[in-house]
């Protein structure tokens, strides 16, 4: 029998600020595939993105507020302690070493990230350490740009949830998660214009943003 209580996943991002578009799809995903824990890991120096507007301490505080009543989530601040870029491959390799060789582990990404995955630093080592769980994004294709990358995807693709639980790593699973049309960019723009975004993020986070004078 497959133990459906062990599978854990890391969910990385800038979270500038954290919002329902981050949290709700992952909560639904956890119910769909039996995730026991989702570890939110904010990036320090995103290699491929602009620097966050909020400080690391402010982003951590917003995350703590957002997940305070959500036992599914825990927070890991290790990447914020680095002064170098947050390379996913290095983080996941360290996590695997901590958890041991047999525990099933996963990394959650969006479909947009899957399409650029072969450009990531040491991407070929990532599936040695974790499964990839891909949340669908509207408007993005399900095929890779290059034949070799498509062959790589086809080799690892699975539709079997149990495979995520009974093997420690190596599979790519396309999840049927809903899309929430919310982004941190939209929230920052609306706050700068003095517009409401109360439906986009937890009230505690919005109150903190106002207290700190962020994004205005």
UniProtKB/Swiss-Prot annotation:
EC numbers, comma separated: 2.7.7.18
Enzyme class per UniProt: transferase
Reactions catalysed: nicotinate beta-D-ribonucleotide + ATP + H(+) = deamido-NAD(+) + diphosphate
Biological process according to GO: NAD biosynthetic process
Pathway named in the protein's UniProt entry: Cofactor biosynthesis; NAD(+) biosynthesis; deamido-NAD(+) from nicotinate D-ribonucleotide: step 1/1
Keywords attached to this entry: ATP-binding, NAD, Nucleotide-binding, Nucleotidyltransferase, Pyridine nucleotide biosynthesis, Transferase
InterPro entries: Cyt_trans-like, NadD/NMNAT, Rossmann-like_a/b/a_fold
GO molecular function, one term: nicotinate-nucleotide adenylyltransferase activity
Cited function: Catalyzes the reversible adenylation of nicotinate mononucleotide (NaMN) to nicotinic acid adenine dinucleotide (NaAD).
PANTHER family reported for this sequence: NICOTINATE-NUCLEOTIDE ADENYLYLTRANSFERASE-RELATED, PHOSPHOPANTETHEINE ADENYLYLTRANSFERASE
Family: Belongs to the NadD family.
NCBIfam families in the cross-refs: cyt_tran_rel (TIGR00125), nicotinate (nicotinamide) nucleotide adenylyltransferase (TIGR00482), PRK00071.1-1 (NF000839)
Protein name per its UniProtKB record: Probable nicotinate-nucleotide adenylyltransferase
Organism whose genome encodes this protein: Klebsiella pneumoniae (strain 342)
Gene designation: nadD
């Amino acid at each position: 029998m497959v133990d459906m209580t062990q599978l854990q996943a890391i969910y990385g991002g800038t979270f500038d600020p954290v919002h329902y578009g981050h949290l709700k799809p992952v909560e639904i995903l956890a119910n769909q595939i039996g995730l026991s824990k989702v570890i939110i890991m904010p990036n320090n120096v995103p290699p491929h993105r602009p620097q966050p507007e909020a400080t690391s301490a402010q982003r951590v505080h917003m995350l703590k507020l957002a997940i305070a009543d959500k036992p599914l989530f825990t927070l890991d601040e290790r990447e914020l302690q680095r002064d170098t870029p947050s390379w996913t491959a290095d983080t996941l390799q360290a996590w695997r070493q901590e958890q041991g060789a047999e525990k099933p582990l996963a990394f959650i990404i969006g479909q947009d990230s899957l399409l650029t995955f072969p450009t990531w630093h040491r991407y070929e080592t990532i599936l040695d350490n974790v499964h990839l769980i891909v949340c669908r994004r509207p408007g993005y294709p399900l095929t890779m740009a290059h034949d070799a990358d498509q062959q790589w995807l086809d080799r690892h693709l699975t539709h079997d949830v149990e495979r995520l639980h009974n093997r420690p790593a190596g599979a790519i699973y396309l999840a049927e998660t809903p899309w929430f049309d919310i982004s941190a960019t939209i929230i920052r723009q609306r706050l700068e214009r003095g517009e409401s975004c109360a439906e986009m993020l937890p009230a505690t986070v919005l109150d903190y943003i106002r207290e700190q004078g962020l994004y205005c």
